[in-house]
Amino acid sequence: KFENRNPRGTLPAYSLLAGRYTIGACIAVDGEGVTYQAIDVTNAHRVVIKEYVPVTMCAARTREGAVVPRAGKEVLFKTTRMDFVDLYRSLVTLGRTEGLVTVLDLVETNNTAYAVREPDEGETLQAYLDAREEPLTQEEALMLLRPVVYGVEAMHRMGLLHRGISPETVFITKTGSAKLSGYATLGLRTADSELKSQMFDGYAAPEQYAVAEFDGKYTDIYGLGALFYRVLTGKTPVPANLRRMNDTLPPAHTVDKEI
């Protein structure tokens, strides 16, 4: 049961998307758009839906729910929407994969696109670590995060990059398994891009702080390395943009000689 109190400019609760998904509460807003709880009426399963409606490019919505780009932003909206569609279409093709939150469907309607995925289960890795009194051992870290590494590897084989690996985008399920969520297009994970960016300082790679630089598999490898640094040392890594100017990040083995 949902409360019909979604913010103005978002889809109203109980509206039906593509004849299949009942929109529920708005649960998050970022530079790419709006995320909703929802129900797949074909099987009564709960899902999460992300609507591509970037605040920097979209000004309004018609009475029928169609997204209206800002004047002068029409072409940019269309091209970045294509990035969103390409990403999530590939993730739908990838299907259920160890260590990844599953993307179930991609819907194109209302002059925009909607990514449908399974809900995030359990708690974030950040909450999990905060509840511990000490860092993980190397054995614990490998056992916990190995599925995430496999998931990132599967994305790379598809030609996809995650760009947002962090304790906030890894979820620990009730069974103790780790899953990576937080998929996003290049613009959301690059500073000073055409979108209002969402960066994870300490985990974002150096090239994510400059629109003129290229990312690659190494971007996610940096994020994984930073993630392991955090779980093994208990310390948040120094942001990459600051490390470029003056690298004050102590090597992990100097924080803990057992590493």
Where are these regions (language model features)?
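AlphaC helix of the protein kinase catalytic domain
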Residues: 125-136
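Conserved short submotifs of the Hanks-type protein kinase catalytic core
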Residues: 110-124
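Activation segment signature within eukaryotic-like protein kinase domains
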Residues: 144-145
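AlphaC helix of the eukaryotic protein kinase fold
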Residues: 64-93
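Protein kinase catalytic-loop region centered on the HRD/HxD motif
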Residues: 148-160
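Protein kinase glycine-rich loop
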Residues: 24-30, 35
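Activation-segment/catalytic-loop signature of the eukaryotic protein kinase fold
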Residues: 105-106
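C-terminal lobe helix-coil module of Hanks-type protein kinase domains
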Residues: 202-259
